């Protein structure tokens, strides 16, 4: 159907209007291409899209014409009319629309509904606005390829995306945000700032970290390790592959296989790239007999995992096939669970606050349709997570059915500078994997005592977090994370020696500094350093040598003169405190 709807879920006026905009666009496209075959056209978070099978490839130049025709349909004030009919009648109606016929075959009911407006008749549950004139603020944005029903073996259709809002002011605000988003796109900045690269010779979704990106990642990882060691975690490392039988025991082979890569044969045994680190940590825990007095035990790893993603959904650093999770697993007694989850929440808040994310949304994701284990343990685990959130006075929403197959979880999504949500920390309580691997400790009575397990990340993955961080700051990272923190610019050759002397003093404090001795003009050097988003440019000439000062220009364009010793002290303080301000 044009938009399959869960009838139990209330539908907002905005969602209804966006869905109607998709139908109006479909009629506009049909008026341009009468032979068009229609796919689906749902409302989405910020607007709508519709998929078409067309006689030619669309170009961006087609969008204004489609939009003009849409505006004509809106002004015509055409009514939306709902009709019900039998599936046989609908098959006759859509005889020349093969995609609609396929959708019809999947509908279990014998009576279906269609919506008509103007010259369009579409298979749809609705609801819709009463008249086309109710769709007042929309803009067509882009064209993309989309496989029919997301299946790469099916035809490739052309998808037109549009934005739609209840009023023109909201639309204008959104379009401004899109314009700013394009400037901050981590794929664009990643290339301009030489942060990372992707190569088809290597394969889609497999990332090369270039020197500038590698130093940012290194700084994040060192900070992560230091904070975990302070909080009682032990750092571990695990292999990238394991025998298939290990994943069968864990349940991943049965519940998660579609996200795993095909097995490889090694000496007659099947191995597979790991999709997760948890099972390795379990085996480490079981490496010897343990007493209940040793708990909790916290293992942390920056572990690279591999998960299958269709080529069509790969996106820079944010959707990849190989990525490094900031992973940790806590083994504890049942009565220690709530306290441990509270500690993880404290750590997660500290980490994301440090990186400058101050707004976030918290979801409590509950038992999915496919799950393992007993219902009472699921309820207990869910209750533990809820209590931990409430004891921290953290507001949250319940996200039904979005837990993982072995346990419920807390998902924290933080907002960037443009108000966009990014996946951040996750915290999962798990009783199932410890049972599957027979994990226990020697209790106070000398008998085996079961152990609970907490899976958690505080950043998510290094790749996705780097994409978010890049877009949050538009590539202008906080000073402590900037690949190059200072560029010294001598006005003339005779000033180079002084510039090199200052650079040496800064390097002794582990400041990342360079001297630009190229035969370019000073203004060109400053401009290039600004484009590279280096926080500080220090210009030195005769006056600066005489006064032992520096003329400071920041990447934002502000200027001042300061004694070098004062600047060095200020810079070191900003780095040590991880300030997000220049």
Swiss-Prot record:
Its EC number is 6.1.1.3. It is found in: Cytoplasm. Residues 185-478 are annotated as: Catalytic. The keyword Metal-binding applies. One of its GO terms (molecular function) is tRNA binding. Zn(2+) binds at residues 278, 329, 455. This is Threonine--tRNA ligase. It comes from Dehalococcoides mccartyi (strain ATCC BAA-2266 / KCTC 15142 / 195). The gene is thrS.
